[in-house]
């Protein structure tokens, strides 16, 4: 490798003095426009550091000479938005559920607000489309454990189910096997009887009369003589082919043996009353509201 520079005979540009396998490196200067632009960006960066928030400090950050804050801009925009919505939200806060249903504009506002709140607070369990999952009800159908009227939905949202709230909805599926109320063979029989109520196939040799007898003695108090359930205690309809935990025999045996006691949180105290009202309207509008 050479230790001195020379001028390239073709380009007239000096070399760096380096050569690799006969290939020499030209010392071509940067274009003047590029150098000027580079220096301008340095000056611009220094100016930006001075006039805008830029450098973090131990407790905050430098504020800059302009005192600009994008968060402050957002706060102003949100305040303006709240001002625009203020009258409508105030009307929504004082309106009854029946009044909201009668007013198309108020109904649209409640649905829009309720949809947003649902996505933030309810979708984790019920799904973004409110179709539910195992143990979490589908809110699009017309099957309601605790009633599907606007008032009933609002009450469920306010106080929850087995949530610990003083006004929570109480009621649970008893553990007939775990408590020793029914024997394993009886549980299998009544599980098949429950399947038959929805037209599902039953185990070969299943005794329908015995299943009906066990059901009448142990289940009618909550689910009713016709097995159509009771929203007063959260007992589901067993004849509509809608299943919260599953309709297969093994799942029904598990349910009857160990019971079910799902929990829904109470939203009173977490969300303001107007927001809960809007969420009730939204859930009611999903298609299954009564």
Swiss-Prot record:
Segments passing through the bilayer: 33-53
Binding site for heme c 2: 173, 219, 222-223
Alphabetical list of PROSITE patterns matching this protein: CYTC (PS51007)
Matches recorded under Pfam families: Cytochrom_C, Cytochrome_CBB3, FixP_N
UniProt record, GO biological process: oxidative phosphorylation; proton transmembrane transport
Reported cofactor(s): heme c
Pathway entry: Energy metabolism; oxidative phosphorylation
Superkingdom per UniProt: Bacteria
Keyword Nuclease: no
UniProt subcellular location: Cell inner membrane
Primary location: membrane
GO molecular-function term, one example from the UniProt record: iron ion binding
Textual note on the cofactor: Binds 2 heme C groups per subunit.
Positions of heme c 1 binding: 122, 125-126, 264
UniProt entry keywords in alphabetical sequence: Cell inner membrane, Cell membrane, Electron transport, Heme, Hydrogen ion transport, Ion transport, Iron, Membrane, Metal-binding, Oxidoreductase, Repeat, Respiratory chain, Transmembrane, Transmembrane helix, Transport
Ranges for domain Cytochrome c: 109-198, 206-287
One GO term describing the cellular component: plasma membrane
Membrane-topology annotation of the record: Single-pass membrane protein
PANTHER family linked to this entry: CBB3-TYPE CYTOCHROME C OXIDASE SUBUNIT FIXP
Its biological purpose: C-type cytochrome. Part of the cbb3-type cytochrome c oxidase complex. FixP subunit is required for transferring electrons from donor cytochrome c via its heme groups to FixO subunit. From there, electrons are shuttled to the catalytic binuclear center of FixN subunit where oxygen reduction takes place. The complex also functions as a proton pump.
Family assignment from sequence similarity: Belongs to the CcoP / FixP family.
Record's subunit section: Component of the cbb3-type cytochrome c oxidase at least composed of FixN, FixO, FixQ and FixP.
Listed name of the protein: Cbb3-type cytochrome c oxidase subunit FixP
């Amino acid at each position: 490798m050479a230790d001195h520079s020379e001028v390239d005979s073709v380009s007239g540009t000096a070399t760096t003095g380096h050569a690799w396998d006969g290939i020499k490196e030209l010392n071509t200067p940067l274009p003047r426009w590029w150098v000027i632009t580079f220096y301008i960006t340095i000056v611009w960066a220094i100016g930006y550091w001075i006039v805008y928030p830029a450098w973090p400090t131990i407790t905050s950050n430098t504020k800059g000479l302009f005192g600009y804050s994008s968060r402050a801009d957002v706060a102003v925009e949100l305040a303006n938005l709240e001002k625009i919505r203020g009258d409508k939200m105030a009307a929504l806060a004082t309106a009854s559920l029946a009044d909201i249903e009668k007013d198309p504009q108020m109904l649209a506002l409640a649905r829009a607000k309720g949809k947003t709140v649902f996505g933030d607070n309810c979708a984790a369990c019920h799904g973004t489309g409110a179709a539910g999952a195992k143990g979490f009800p589908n809110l699009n159908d017309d099957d309601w454990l605790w009633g599907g009227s606007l008032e009933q939905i609002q009450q469920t949202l306010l106080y929850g189910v087995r949530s610990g709230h003083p006004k929570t909805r109480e009621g649970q599926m008893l553990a007939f096997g775990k408590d020793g109320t029914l024997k394993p063979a009886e549980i299998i029989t009544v599980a098949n009887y429950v399947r038959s109520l929805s037209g599902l196939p039953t185990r070969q040799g299943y005794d329908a009369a015995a299943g009906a007898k066990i059901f009448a003695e142990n289940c009618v108090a909550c689910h009713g003589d016709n097995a159509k359930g009771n929203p007063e205690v959260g007992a589901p309809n067993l004849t509509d082919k809608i299943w919260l935990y599953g309709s297969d025999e093994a799942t029904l045996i598990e349910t009857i043996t160990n019971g079910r006691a799902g929990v829904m949180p109470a939203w009173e105290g977490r969300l303001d009353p107007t927001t809960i009202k809007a969420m009730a309207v939204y859930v009611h509008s999903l298609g299954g509201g009564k």
